[in-house]
Each structure stands twice: as structure tokens, then as C-alpha cells.
Amino acid sequence: MAYLKDYSSGRILLTIDGEYIKDYQTGRYKYRINGDKIVDYQTGRYLYDISGGYVKDYQTGRYLLTISSSQVKDYRSGLIIAQYDTSIIKDYRTGRMLYKIDGFLSGREITSLLAILFVV
């Protein structure tokens, strides 16, 4: 299990436990990672396909993000949005630390988390 925290306040925002991502404040499950797909937990609707280093809108088929080993890029413009490592996610333009990850995440879990954070 891992926690996503707001970097400046230290407040826990999400818990990531295997295939489930839960809102820490409400205790409600928000997303489920189903293989290479991210599913809205409440509705069961497929939201994103996260295969091959890309984040694609499941409904429209439109590519949204490119996720490499340390960066998140906007697919259309190619602009770097964020940088990350195993414990910190920061805004690329400002260098400001956005989120802290407490705990271990697999590659699939970190990709899913980045998709959820930066697509919306």
C-alpha cells in the first residue's frame, strides 16, 4: 500500500492498494486498475488505456499523455508537464514539488496514478 500526499501540506489525498485507488478523505474507492485500463470504480466505466507508455482516452481513442521513466508529456504538444521519481512528483515548468509518495508503487501503479493526476 502507498499514499499520495500533497507535498506542501503533507495531507494524504489517495491510497493506492494493488488495483484499487481510494480517496483518503472520504474513504471511497475512486478507480480500479484492470490490467492496462483505468476504470471508474463507481460506474464501472473504462476511462483510460495506459499501455505502451501512452495514456489514451478509452471512449474516444485519443492519445492524451506520454509517460516515460521520469517525465509526463502532453501527447499533442510534446510539452513536459511533470517529472517524477519513486517518491516525488513535481511541476516541470516551475520546479515546485506537487506530491509525495509514501510507500512502494509498481510501474503500472505509478503510470495509473500519473494518468489520473494529469489527464483531468
Where does each model-flagged region fall?
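Long terminal segments
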Residues: 1-19, 25-28, 35-36, 43-45, ...
